[in-house]
Amino acid sequence: MFTIKTLNAISPVGLAKLNKNLFDVSVDTEAPDGILVRSADLLNTTFNENLLAIARAGAGVNNIPLDRCSEQGIVVFNTPGANANAVAELVIGMLIAGSRNVPAAAQWTQGLAEDPNMAKDVEKGKKQFVGNEIQGKTLGVIGLGAIGSRVANCAIELGMEVYGYDPYISIDAAWNLSSQVHHCVNLNDMLPRCDYLTIHVPYLPTTKDTINAQTLALCKDGVKILNYARGELVNTAALLDAMEAGKVSGYMTDFPSDAILGRPGIVCTPHLGASTPEAEDNCAVMAAQEISDYLKNGNITHSVNLPEVHQPRAGGKRICIIHKNEPGMISQITALTTEAGLNIENMVNKSKKNMAYTMLDATGAVNAKLAEKLAAIPAVIRVRIL
């Protein structure tokens, strides 16, 4: 029986994916094997020694201490793409609403309550909110992952010309992307073409201020920008300067701040991107499936600190080893399995940056004594026998 601790409210649809005969799920477990979390801050949390995995029901993991988890052999999962449709729909909605000045027009209309000349004033006042259709306009998409590719495909269906930039596009994302999306190998080449620009990349030290004074200077005059990924991707000071100069005519974002609230041409929503019951269910289901498969079978899917490794069972017992990505590890591991007289049926080894994961199915004396010897290898962090 594995114990799972839930932090925050996790959708019952997701929890139902955890077999009650194998998983004891509780908010009170003191020393869990796994943690399911949404937004709870774990950065200063002391983890119990037997904690094996943390699954975040969402994409961002800035509330989880990744380096410390790696050092302790804790696999951290997220759920990329589970909320993709929710975010993509909102982006498309705000693209249209922002282009037609709907937010400002709707707010102005509220002031007409009990106006005896409402019909006349509506016809007179609507001129100040005239906007543009998006059909035939050009959209630039920075980041073509689960969300960016959906936005690009939807924009194509709406009759837009779409350019995409993503030097790290995955094979799956590329397969799902419309062939009508123009792929740019250089961001600077894409920016001058775009009437609208939307960004869909994770927040990392290397992506902070992706939209800055230099990139904005390359944009077409009057460009409208949408940011439904992370607030830090856009340099606020540079954005405000560009709006003051007329370079940027509109900014729609899910990340309000004092610096941008109340500014003309800026529309802020209260982090609505993934806030749908469907997205919460999808995230919870994916997180539960990831943590279940890892605890039961050692398979790793959508981990942010360990490599992607999954392998069908081949009989015997399964040995799972988290270790540092160093030369000679395989020879040290197989030397011990040979010494123990094991027959290896299947074996896989993959790495991710400075971390690696070796998983093998073997028949023979797979026991605690062997696990102790494997754990004694200097670069080994954790050993599990399943």
Per-region residue spans from a language model:
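N-terminal Rossmann-fold NAD(P) dinucleotide-binding loop
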Residues: 148-149
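Rossmann-like adenosine-cofactor binding region
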Residues: 43-45, 167-259, 275
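A conserved regulatory-domain signal marking ACT and ACT-like small-molecule sensing domains
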Residues: 301, 305-386
